[in-house]
Amino acid sequence: MRRFHFTSPGPLAALLLLTAALSGCAGYPPEYLWRVLTWGDADVGDVDRFPARTLQASPRPQHLPQALDDDAVQRAFEAWRPGQRLDALLQDTGTQAFLVLHRGQVVYERYFHGASRDTVVTSFSVAKSFLAVLVGLAIEDGRIGSLHDPITQYLPELAGRDARFERITVHHLLRMASGIRYREVSFFHGDNARTYYHPDLRALALQHTRIDGEPGRHFLYNNYHPLLLGLILERATGERITDYLQRRLWTPMGMAYGGSWSLDSKASGFEKLESGLNARAIDFAKLGLLVLNDGRRDGEVVVPSVWMQAMLEPTANAPDDYNAGMPWMAHHPDVYYADLWWGLRRNDGLHEVAARGNHGQLVYVSRRHQVVVVRNGLRYGIGSMEWMRLAEAVAAGLGGR
């Protein structure tokens, strides 16, 4: 999202709200206009602004053993950035938490800017990767028939607006290749602002989505996709998203602490599927461990391995211009997007994968090197892709020991 510059939510914001209502924004809910004007760009403080639904700590918590080795992690980092200190970079980039796990043990755990292990941090788009796992569980439970189901099977009102929605499948949403329009522009009219601040995300997704292209033709990062997937999940399971997460994933994974999922508003009560999962960094690391262990915890199946593998694979037989809507990817030819997960291709198929979020939130998983890297931060501090490259270097350095 782009930053909106306003000085305070006082008389100036009230005047701007009135001006907005008189200048083409009258169709937006006042609460939406107020949020855009007074909250500005999405930031980590939003965990305290949005209402939320609570997650309880697992009664069978998974406590991660420690074998701290800061020097080994520093050496791995220095191979990538010679002569630099990792802790200095983390401090300078607004990092709150940085954790490294190797073979299931915590080998590095540092906190900055007043944060500690008890600090609850917001996921931003890391939440999308949790959502992908939930979709796989709903398929396993028989609540969603298959990836190839048309989304109108669960959201028939979309077909009433435009019959072309019938051609979009659940998998198109997971791959962010639906052809649904998504435009990032400044101020109220951008889909980036709408999908983040709107107080009724169900209505937004069902009534205001438009189709621009052919399903499966192009990848375009689009926050309507997780909203629609959340609606499908909600209707298919008959449960609130947070409740389904609690029962099928949070508790079985052994989350040692509680958390929450931010809601669009108290009145609507719909989870912010695109961004709003809030937890401690040490529990976010368990998502990475779930990937490392092919969906198992202590030998018990939490998520079927077939889903864990399929969810992380690059798109097969993609057109040559599949990523044309994301031109920055041309500079990173090894980068791909799977089912709400990012990846770095490897020739032998054992790809590096990551859940990534705004301001540099990261859960990076190297199955080859048995490493998980978690970073939470106040801001990016360095380029967005640089956090993946840093984690890649740390994983390679530790894996070579």
How does the language model describe each region?
Residues 2-13:
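Bacterial N-terminal signal peptides that target proteins for export
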Residues 10, 19-116, 140-144, 393-401:
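N-terminal leader/targeting segments and the immediately adjacent pre-domain N-terminus
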Residues 26-34, 352-401:
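Structured C-terminal helix/loop/strand segments within mature extracytoplasmic catalytic/sensor domains
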Residues 89-99, 112-157, 161-168, 214-221:
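Short active-site loop at a secondary-structure junction
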Residues 104, 122-147, 173, 229-233, ...:
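Active-site SXXK
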Residues 122, 141-180, 210, 235-274, ...:
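Active-site helix/loop module of the DD-peptidase/beta-lactamase fold
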Residues 225-232, 276-297, 306, 361-377:
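Active-site-proximal alpha-helical segments within enzyme catalytic domains
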Residues 255-262, 313-372:
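Active-site Gly/Thr loop motif
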